[in-house]
Structures are given as C-alpha cells and as structure tokens.
C-alpha cells in the first residue's frame, strides 16, 4: 500500500526543484548500496562542496571501475538535484559511502589499502610513479585542498604533473585524472 496525501501548491513548489511542478510528488527511502567484499580502488572526496563536482566524480568513478567513492568532511549533499543531474544515473550504480575520517581509516585498514592525498606540496610525488593499485586517493575541496588532519593520515602524497604556470585543476577533473591512473594501473 502507498500512502497518499494532498498538499497545497506552495508546499509542492517548495519540495520540487523544478520551476513548474509536474503535479504528483513522492518520497522514497533510498536503499543503501552494498560495498564489494574486498576494496581495491577507492576515491575519497573531502569537503568537495560543489554538487556538480561530486556528481561528476561519481559518474567518472562508475565509468572507470572504482569500487567505491567515499565522501568525508562536509561534501555536497549526495542527493541534491545538481549532484544527481551531474552523476547522470551513475548514482544508482556506483557505491558511495559517507563517513568520518576515523571510519575512513578503519575501512582502508580493513581492506589493506594505502591512502594517498592529492596535494600541491613539495612532498608530493608524480602520480605516475606511485603504485595506485590497490590504493585509495583523496581529493580535497576546491578552495582549500585536503585538510591537515587527512594529509597526516595519508601514506603518501601525489601530484598531477602540469605545465609550468598552471595553478591547479578543478576537483572533478583532478579526480578524473587520478581515477584514470588507478584504472590503468589495475588493468
């Protein structure tokens, strides 16, 4: 049985992200996705607040065969309309986990995965020279990068080589480059 309620137009407009409501509105319980028994390829987003970037990373992770995407540190809402739109359906195929940093470390330890942080530091190594399969790689927020706390948890730091004078990459683009390297290393 499905419960039905009548709502006034103002409430329906508030609940719907569309300019003009299509009429019926429904709510659903979103089932949790099961993680694979053994994780080998994980991409971590910390504090990535742009929902378009989060959705794009989920879509790319699905295309490149990542085992899971982990969101930590106040990332954009996984089910915001912009995230869902940017994910282009991958949100319903790609396992995504939201957790604390402590839970992230426990998950990676349980799977024997090293964690590398993408960072613009002197300590960072060219990602092409780091064994990324199996591994987890963390990408930080658009403005601040990875937090000092998460960098301290990392087994190493990686950098995407760029042309002189290039400042940085968008978080979703950086994640895509990293995921391609992870996928290539695992082939």
Residues covered by each model-derived region:
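Structured adenosyl-cofactor binding patch, chiefly the S-adenosyl-L-methionine
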Residues: 26, 60-64, 75-91, 148-187
């Amino acid at each position: 049985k499905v419960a039905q309620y009548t709502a006034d137009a103002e409430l329906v407009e508030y609940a719907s992200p569309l300019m003009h409501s299509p009429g019926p509105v429904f709510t659903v319980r979103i089932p949790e996705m099961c993680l694979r028994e053994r994780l080998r390829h994980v991409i971590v987003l910390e504090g990535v607040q742009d929902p378009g970037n989060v959705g794009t990373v989920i879509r790319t992770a699905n295309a490149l065969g990542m085992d899971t995407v982990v969101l930590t540190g106040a990332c954009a809402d996984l089910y915001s309309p912009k995230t869902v739109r940017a994910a282009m359906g991958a949100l319903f195929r790609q396992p995504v986990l939201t957790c604390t940093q402590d839970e992230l470390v426990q998950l990676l330890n349980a799977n024997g995965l090293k964690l590398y942080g993408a960072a613009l530091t002197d300590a960072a190594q060219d990602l092409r020279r780091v064994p990324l399969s199996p591994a987890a790689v963390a990408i930080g927020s658009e403005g601040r990068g990875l937090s000092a706390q998460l960098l301290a948890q990392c087994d190493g730091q990686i950098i995407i080589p760029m042309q002189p004078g290039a400042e940085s990459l968008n978080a979703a683009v950086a994640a895509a480059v990293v995921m391609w390297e992870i996928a290539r290393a695992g082939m």
